[in-house]
Swiss-Prot record:
The gene is ssuD. GO terms for biological process: alkanesulfonate catabolic process. Keywords: Flavoprotein, FMN, Monooxygenase, Oxidoreductase. One of its GO terms (molecular function) is alkanesulfonate monooxygenase activity. InterPro entries: Alkanesulphonate_mOase_FMN-dep, Luciferase-like_dom, Luciferase-like_sf, SsuD_RutA_monooxygenase. This is Alkanesulfonate monooxygenase. Disulfide bonds: none annotated. It catalyses: an alkanesulfonate + FMNH2 + O2 = an aldehyde + FMN + sulfite + H2O + 2 H(+). FMNH(2) which is absolutely required for this enzymatic reaction, is provided by SsuE. Homotetramer. Its EC number is 1.14.14.5. Catalyzes the desulfonation of aliphatic sulfonates. PANTHER family: ALKANESULFONATE MONOOXYGENASE, ALKANESULFONATE MONOOXYGENASE-RELATED. Transmembrane segments: none annotated.
Amino acid sequence: MSLNMFWFLPTHGDGHYLGTEEGSRPVDHGYLQQIAQAADRLGYTGVLIPTGRSCEDAWLVEASMIPVTQRLKFLVALRPSVTSPTVAARQAATLDRLSNGRALFNLVTGSDPQELAGDGVFLDHSERYEASAEFTQVWRRLLLGETVDFNGKHIHVRGAKLLFPPIQQPYPPLYFGGSSDVAQELAAEQVDLYLTWGEPPELVKEKIEQVRAKAAAHGRKIRFGIRLHVIVRETNDEAWQAAERLISHLDDETIAKAQAAFARTDSVGQQRMAALHNGKRDNLEISPNLWAGVGLVRGGAGTALVGDGPTVAARINEYAALGIDSFVLSGYPHLEEAYRVGELLFPHLDVAIPEIPQPQPLNPQGEAVANDFIPRNVAQS
């Protein structure tokens, strides 16, 4: 099975070390462009663009990267709690059309009550997933070309429609990650690819089996992906030394503050990440070559595969054997590590190299009539 390898655009900051200004660098458009173009040339399938108040806006970043790349796909967040599904569907179709079919979408429900409150969202965990399920139903139906009437608990639309369809059919793929039962049910019923953070293989296997069974109950099959950091070097010793350097500037106070911030979230996935290290520096290798040091101060994905190219490739293939076909990777700093992964790791894997998409012809059309419909040739109607 050929593997889809993704990289990451660090719109929330980048550098050589975690938890310090030492070794940090400006993350401007030029730097992000360098990373995107490196990923484009090295054969990555796409890049994940993060979301949240600590990040630049993912959709605007994607739009600015489309003209400077050729084959790279962009995985950006859909935020059900803060965006109308009809507006999001129009935006998604536009990005897909402007990128010639290179748009991918990642459903993000949110997990930090403080950040959500700042965005005007005061729904609890179960309510957010109710709203996300309704949002996704409307979003998908619009992209499928339906005129939608929907009267849900959280979302109400009447006569919603999309005049300009996406390039990808039936619609751009929808990704999603969540570890709670309600999250897995949403994935099983509505998404195309289920993402998990980098837990040990036995825990990932358990999650995949749960989601696969839930999807089968809905008569569906979905794909699986995993989100990991990577520290790959020419030798295993060099890789482990690089891992230690990454957290060499962390002090106990910074770790404690970060863990306190993570503890206030209601994300089951974040709780599972924290349980891998319990905020302690010792015993960070939680599974062969799987290191939890990143999660001491970084929310979300908090584990890294560490080793030389053949060793890391062997661990990736262990996950692939569980049914995972997509790997969303990152490393610090992201420009240099994009090259290291491409040069030291890719030769040991069966990497799916994306082709440059051919321009898709769009049907000619006149201006929309009354902002409501596309005119047809009356003589042919």
